[in-house]
């Protein structure tokens, strides 16, 4: 608050190396005293700076350097370059490297262990085998959206939207590819993704590429802490409108049931973060008739509820 600058010494006594060329700094969501810093050149790796809550006093700082990890199969991972780091809602740290992506689960005590996890994608061909997620892809950027999905930008293959399936500490944990955007199927000016930023309140994803900046309006926003601000738009829905109806202001893991004026179930939706989208059709794919519809919102536990009305005019 006094407007003064303070410097941090990234010299670590244990490894006897000097660390420089810092990448984008990530403040750990578990403890803001922990700062994760990718080192882009010379002694490439991750630096963990622990400032003990006193950033103006370097005497009580602790700096540790990490450049080798052991995956779930006891295989060492020593990336030649680290480009990106992000942390999801469950405090898992995702690291993008020159040869793929790996995770440091929140269950790992990184001060005592160098364990990590590489996500396996099943081949689903009857062999029981799988492949590592984005193996040998250079990962330039990682961002987490309001539904806790990963947006992963690569050096040559565009951007992937990945949805976690299961608990990361379980052997069956995997990722499903929700979308894969390239110059062939989108307006992206280049398949070289350099940076990603997400406005979580709106779901807009900004993608910096080798050919310029683009944005994409996703269907996931930051979840609300309660249902006090639930609403739907557009509302009313006019006959000429053919797009999605958005129900926003919902809590995490919300199920939205669309009911007609008679209380009959028309459609069941699953929220993504703070948003659920409805195409205005029933469970059989038919556009619903004119009328007032109720969006009944319930959390997974059923302890909290919210409601909003939608007027359909056909």
Provide a role label for each language-model segment.
Residues 34-38, 92-95, 149-153, 203-208:
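Conserved beta-propeller blade signature
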Residues 1-5, 49-59, 105-116, 163-173, ...:
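Short loop/turn segments immediately following beta-strands, especially the blade-tip
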Residues 191-227:
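Blade-level signature of beta-propeller repeat domains, shared across WD40, Kelch, NHL, RCC1
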Residues 271-303:
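Short, surface-exposed loop/turn motifs with a glycine/proline- and acidic-biased composition
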Residues 11-30, 68-89, 122-146, 180-199, ...:
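Short coil-to-beta transitions that initiate beta-strands within beta-rich domains
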Residues 30, 38-42, 98, 106, ...:
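Short loop/turn segments immediately following the C-termini of beta-strands
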């Amino acid at each position: 608050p006094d407007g003064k600058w303070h410097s941090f010494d990234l010299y670590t006594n244990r490894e006897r190396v000097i660390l420089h060329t810092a990448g984008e700094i990530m403040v750990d969501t578990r403890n803001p005293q922990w700062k994760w810093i990718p080192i882009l050149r010379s002694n490439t790796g991750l630096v963990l700076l622990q400032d003990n809550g006193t950033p103006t006093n370097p005497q009580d700082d602790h700096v540790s350097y990490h450049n080798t990890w052991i995956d779930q199969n006891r295989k060492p991972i020593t990336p030649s370059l680290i480009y990106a780091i992000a942390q999801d809602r469950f405090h898992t740290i995702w690291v993008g490297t020159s040869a793929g992506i790996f995770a440091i689960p929140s269950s790992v005590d990184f001060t005592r262990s160098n364990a990590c996890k590489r996500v396996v994608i099943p081949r689903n061909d009857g062999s029981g085998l799988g492949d590592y997620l984005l193996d040998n892809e250079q990962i330039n950027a990682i961002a987490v959206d309001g539904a806790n999905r990963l947006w992963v930008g690569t050096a040559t293959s565009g951007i992937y939207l990945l949805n976690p399936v299961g608990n990361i500490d379980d052997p069956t944990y995997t990722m499903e590819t929700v979308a894969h955007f390239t110059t062939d199927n989108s307006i992206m000016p280049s398949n070289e993704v350099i940076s990603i930023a997400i406005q979580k309140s709106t779901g807009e994803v900004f993608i910096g590429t080798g050919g310029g900046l683009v944005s994409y309006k996703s269907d996931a926003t930051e979840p609300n802490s309660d249902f006090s601000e639930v609403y739907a738009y557009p509302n009313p829905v006019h006959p000429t409108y053919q797009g999605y109806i958005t129900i926003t202001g919902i809590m995490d893991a919300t199920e939205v049931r669309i009911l007609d004026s008679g209380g009959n179930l028309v459609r069941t939706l699953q929220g993504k973060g703070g948003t659920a989208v409805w195409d205005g059709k029933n469970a059989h794919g038919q556009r619903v008739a004119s009328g007032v519809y109720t969006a009944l919102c319930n959390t997974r536990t059923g302890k909290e509820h919210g409601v909003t009305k939608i007027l359909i005019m056909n």
